[in-house]
């Protein structure tokens, strides 16, 4: 869809109005890195991103270094056909980062999710610059322990498990 379908230009609604109120521009920015700092993997981060991913009607979604492959039947049930998913795994960090940059630069996907622990600030800056020029959703999912590490990401959110779902706070 065009700018009409996705609300404010350069922003995709999160699907959660209370979260949109907290997010700059009223949704997930498609102009730069969004860093999600997770207390642990599998606490509901994919459920959080699902409404935004569902809005990418027909576009591919790149998943780099996912900690585990999501259930394909579960994806299909949530309106995300597995054939739209691009799984990328690499053993060397340099290859992971290169792949992420290529995805951002070639514009063939609507979203990129990168799971990564320690990354040099310079490498994150390169990704951020590529993401700024991409008009794609670009989430980097890292351990909460990285909250104190320098990051060029304009938006850094800390995600912790909560009895009612997720506790989301800004990480600085």
Over which residues does each language-model region extend?
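Short glycine-/polar-rich loops that comprise or flank the Walker A/P-loop
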Residues: 81-83, 107-109, 134-137, 152-155, ...
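Hydrophobic/aromatic ligand-binding patch that stacks against planar heteroaromatic rings
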Residues: 55, 103, 130
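Conserved P-loop NTPase nucleotide-binding/switch module
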Residues: 121-145
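Long, charge-dense
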Residues: 62-119, 124-127
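Short, structured patches in soluble enzyme cores that scaffold and shape functional sites
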Residues: 115-117, 140-143, 161
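Glycine-rich, charge-decorated loop segments at or immediately adjacent to ligand/cofactor-binding or catalytic sites
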Residues: 71-75, 145-160
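Detector for small/aliphatic-rich hydrophobic stretches
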Residues: 1-63, 77, 82
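Conserved small/polar residues in nucleotide/adenosyl-binding loops
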Residues: 171-172
């Amino acid at each position: 869809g065009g700018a009409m379908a996705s609300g404010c230009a350069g922003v995709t609604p999160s699907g959660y109005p209370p979260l949109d109120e907290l997010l700059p521009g009223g949704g997930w920015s498609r102009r730069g890195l969004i860093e999600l700092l997770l207390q642990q993997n599998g606490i509901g981060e994919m459920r959080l991103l699902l409404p935004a991913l569902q809005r990418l009607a027909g576009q591919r979604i790149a998943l780099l270094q996912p900690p585990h492959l999501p259930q394909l039947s579960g994806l299909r049930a949530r309106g995300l056909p597995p054939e739209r998913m691009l799984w990328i795994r690499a053993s060397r960090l340099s290859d992971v980062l290169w792949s992420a940059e290529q995805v951002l630069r070639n514009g063939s996907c609507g979203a990129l999710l990168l799971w990564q622990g320690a990354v040099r600030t310079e490498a994150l800056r390169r990704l951020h610059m590529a993401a700024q020029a991409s008009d794609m959703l670009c989430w980097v999912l890292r351990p909460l322990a990285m909250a104190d590490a320098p990051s060029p990401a304009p938006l850094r959110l800390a995600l912790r498990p909560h009895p009612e779902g997720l506790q989301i706070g800004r990480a600085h």
